[in-house]
Amino acid sequence: MDDKQRFESLMAPVEDPTAAPLTVQRFLPEEAREALPEFAALIDLWLERRGGAAVPDWNDVDFTDFRSWHAYILLSKFEGAEPDPRFRLAGEKVAEVLQFETQGRRISDLAPRFYELQFRDHFHKIREHGLIGLTSGKLPAKGRGHATLRILELPFRDGGTTVERLLHAQAKEAA
């Protein structure tokens, strides 16, 4: 396999076209902690760092704030108007569950059908309304349908007034 073929295989969609949709939910900040107790520490930190804003700014947190969660988080950023975040970083426990490369890829690159079916609207609402998201269910990836996901999605501003970043965290007991 030459370099071009290897690159194309790494960048190909990973979704299983026969997989069932995931469950996507959104919560108001004041509802999230009670609804998602396994993520209470992250939600408390997020709520604390909001200050008077609806959504905290990424500059108001430090990576060390997530110390016990490092292995379980993915970081992503919205680039432009489309609510299709590009993944920047994945912790080793998340990578172990997913078993495919996420860094530098968008949701629509990894799962184009599910992006259109669920995630465009889901991330649009999180981004527009500062909601906290949850994605759960069986991983809809080829050969990974046995793996369970339960991923919290926390929105962050990035120096402005709009949501530009997400911190995704896989539940520790699901990893």
Language-model segments: which ranges?
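Sensory/regulatory domains in signal-transduction proteins
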Residues: 2-14, 22-175
